Amino acid sequence: VLFRSLAPDTGGAGRRRGGMGAEVALTISIPQAEALVMTHGLEVPNSVGLSGGQPGGVIAQSLAKDFLAHAGDRPAVRPLDADDHRDFAPLGPKPGAFPMTSADVFAVTWQGGGGIGDPLDRDPDDVVADVRRGVVSRHAAETDYGVVLRAEVSAAGFARSPST
């Protein structure tokens, strides 16, 4: 395992935000092998939202061929980081068997829980706290919760978008 963490923006938006999914990146410890991955929830989320809440995110799985051979002094592998994400090719819901080498990196992000209640009813202070902790991105704060963040995020660093 090269990396594992909770994944931002994977819990469904809601007055009560859904729990976060996780992400993991791994490689094999032998020179080469055939890998087989089977998942459910890649195209349609399994965890629905309730009472106006949004569903949790769908599963994402990808493969970066020869990633470690060309990684150089890159920081730790984290598939959702913009700098490294371009190297990962999506595998789709049922890729079948595929070859892997010890230089390849397989990454998967699994879904979080569904949200409960209208996301616009979530307390803006809670949304700001979610952004500060890396649970929700600034983009999701604005598009899902209607909370527009200022450049500096502080306990009072929010403003509702004009549409709410």
Please name every model-derived segment.
Residues V1-T164:
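Glycine/proline-enriched, intrinsically flexible loops and inter-domain linkers
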